[in-house]
Amino acid sequence: MTLDDSSLQKYGFIKRETLGSINIDPLQTGGLLTEAARQALVEWGDGYSVCDFCGGVLDQIKKPPIHDFVHKALPEFLGCDEARVTNGARESKFAVMHSMGKPGDWIVLDGLAHYSSYVAAERAGLNVKVVPHAGSPEYYLDPEGYGTAIEEVTKESGKPPVLALVTYPDGSYGNIPDAGKIASVCHEYEVPLLLNGAYCVGRMPVSAKEIGADFIVGSGHKSMAASGPVGVLGVSEEYAPIVFRKSVYSKVKEVELLGCTARGATVMTMIASFPEVVKRVRNWDQEVENARWFSARLEDMGFIQRGQKPHSHDLMFFEAPGFYEISQKIKKGRYFLYKELKERNIHGIKSGLTKYFKLSTFGLGKEKLGVVADSFEEILKKYENV
């Protein structure tokens, strides 16, 4: 490629096509920036903007107040002893896995774990034992399955796994497992537990200490109204010296964080949104009520919600026999739903999906959720004689 003026025209400022739509994409609903974060994005957008008064360690910067955010606010918010800001939830998971295990060791994952949990384990050289779920329709995860998995690893390898992980909730069905019971089971075998709260931290109340988790992971760009990539990591006092160990070459830098992590706009948008994020977590009961109301509306139309019932999270998975039947009868039917929703200024269901899809009701409120539900009903009626 020749980098001449003509070829460079496709780059530069690019408008976002979906901006302003009613957004039901589970990846995006919890990451929409607050007004304060949008201002911070411009104010702190330069690469190393937060380093005007840096003494060499990101989380020790006091102006802006990154130190207080990381060492005072985040531990309280996450319910942990020590916390750090990272470049994302997957980076947080890898930091824990890499510091807790050695190549060839084992880790236990739930059957609904995100792909990045597997990849993080793979990158750390760990073997994976999976706790199976019960399958359709609820995909229930039995806490006792962790005990079985730990015993299997111990029998096969001669020693217990170095870590167990539970996804809370999972990113497919929005199920919230009994993490407290899982923690108890794991601790009976002296196996520490990592709570993957990428869809939890910043949306709903959660405390690592109350659950009994030794580690907690969150995603700023997925659930804390921050500009990504940015995440959080909370660690118990017992394991903090392991995960946050210092480099022998640069004595103030933490090895697993490669010294410093989220700099500039990422950490500052997270900080800017934090007051509102704390407040919205207190409104979680209303979010659950809205999700259940929306699910009931869709099920009245013939949709089938998979996963836990009654549901306790904004992320939901639906089977849509009505939409799928339409897609089989019309030209280019795979894409009809995406086009119909786009015409109604609704974004979030991926192009080509009609039989199964997931969505999120987070932050929309009853009025916008009503618009989405009404739109689904209108689309079904539009094609009922096809």
Swiss-Prot record:
Single GO MF annotation: Sep-tRNA:Cys-tRNA synthase activity
* Cofactor(s) the record lists: pyridoxal 5'-phosphate
Matching InterPro entries, A to Z?
PyrdxlP-dep_Trfase (IPR015424), PyrdxlP-dep_Trfase_major (IPR015421), PyrdxlP-dep_Trfase_small (IPR015422), Sep_Cys-tRNA_synth_arc (IPR013375), SepSecS/SepCysS (IPR008829)
Q: Which PANTHER family match?
A: CYSTEINE DESULFURASE, O-PHOSPHO-L-SERYL-TRNA:CYS-TRNA SYNTHASE
Similarity annotation: Belongs to the SepCysS family.
Q: Which NCBIfam families does the protein's record reference? A: PRK09331.1, SepCysS
Q: What is this protein called?
A: O-phospho-L-seryl-tRNA:Cys-tRNA synthase
